């Protein structure tokens, strides 16, 4: 993420982080490389040849003042995933930033939208490397669905979907959640007792805070 990661790696080991990972056989189609801000052309080729995925975490990059990845330089064959690096619980917001930063870096509107579409489907493909039963919308597939409470104010079709998705759908509340055919949320109301989960979250949150305080 930081330029210092690359600098220290070069000073201590004579190679970039990507080249070191490759040298030790740690790059393959199940590998996730986070951030990838400070890459050279050889790094990008190694990533592309390995089949590894790159995960962008723009909120973290901006918070840490380390710059942003050069989106257009990554080979098209490299899977692009959208993450948060723990900065929030809304990885879909990274989709919008992927579009905006693409535009900021000089991409045409069409190319920036194409990158968002690529990332959307790259994530589905990558998930199936780990979860072979990751569902589809085809008949007979496991019913894992989310329905947003969104009424489009302008024409909504295959040509306008991505604009609606980025600036309309993702701004709305979740209306329905179905997991394996079970209704978990209906009309934005969770359909099972939540207290036991929230209590556990509070306990684990306090434990995590204490562990960080001990380390510091």
Predicted regions and their residues:
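His/Asp/Glu-enriched, well-ordered alpha-helical/loop segment
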Residues: 23-26, 72-152
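Short, charged, surface-exposed secondary-structure boundary motifs
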Residues: 63-69, 90-94, 157
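Divalent metal-coordination and catalytic microenvironments
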Residues: 33, 47, 54, 85, ...
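Active-site microenvironment of metallo-dependent hydrolases
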Residues: 117-216
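Short, electropositive alpha-helical surface patch
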Residues: 47-59, 203-211
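Histidine/acidic residue-rich metal-binding segments in metalloenzymes
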Residues: 1-53, 64-80, 132
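Short, acidic/turn-prone active-site loops that include or flank metal/cofactor-
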Residues: 1, 58-63, 85-88
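Conserved beta-strand positions
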Residues: 35, 56-57, 82, 148
